[in-house]
Amino acid sequence: MEALVYVFLLIGTLVVIFFAIFFRDPPRIAKK
């Protein structure tokens, strides 16, 4: 059960970092 929690936290952290970079620097593809 603890392994599942660690995996969830890891994915959550990656998602937060991804969205932080995504919203801070809007990709040019979205502006097409």
Curated annotation (Swiss-Prot):
Does Ribonucleoprotein show up as a keyword for this record?
no
Q: Output a single Gene Ontology CC term carried by this record.
A: chloroplast thylakoid membrane
Could you list this entry's UniProt keywords, alphabetically sorted: Chloroplast, Membrane, Photosynthesis, Photosystem II, Plastid, Thylakoid, Transmembrane, Transmembrane helix
Transmembrane spans:
3-23
Query: Which domain of life does the UniProt lineage start with?
Result: Eukaryota
Gene Ontology biological process terms, A to Z: photosynthesis
Q: What is its main location?
A: plastid
**Lipid bilayer topology:** Single-pass membrane protein
Compartment annotation? Plastid, Chloroplast thylakoid membrane
Query: Has the keyword Zinc been applied to this entry?
Result: no
Q: What's one Pfam family here?
A: PsbT
What does the subunit section of this Swiss-Prot or TrEMBL entry state?
A: PSII is composed of 1 copy each of membrane proteins PsbA, PsbB, PsbC, PsbD, PsbE, PsbF, PsbH, PsbI, PsbJ, PsbK, PsbL, PsbM, PsbT, PsbY, PsbZ, Psb30/Ycf12, at least 3 peripheral proteins of the oxygen-evolving complex and a large number of cofactors. It forms dimeric complexes.
| PANTHER family assigned | PHOTOSYSTEM II REACTION CENTER PROTEIN T (PTHR36411:SF2), PTHR36411
**Family, per the entry?**
Belongs to the PsbT family.
What is the protein's known function?
Found at the monomer-monomer interface of the photosystem II (PS II) dimer, plays a role in assembly and dimerization of PSII. PSII is a light-driven water plastoquinone oxidoreductase, using light energy to abstract electrons from H(2)O, generating a proton gradient subsequently used for ATP formation.
Its name, as the record gives it, is: Photosystem II reaction center protein T
Q: Please name the source species.
A: Cyanidium caldarium
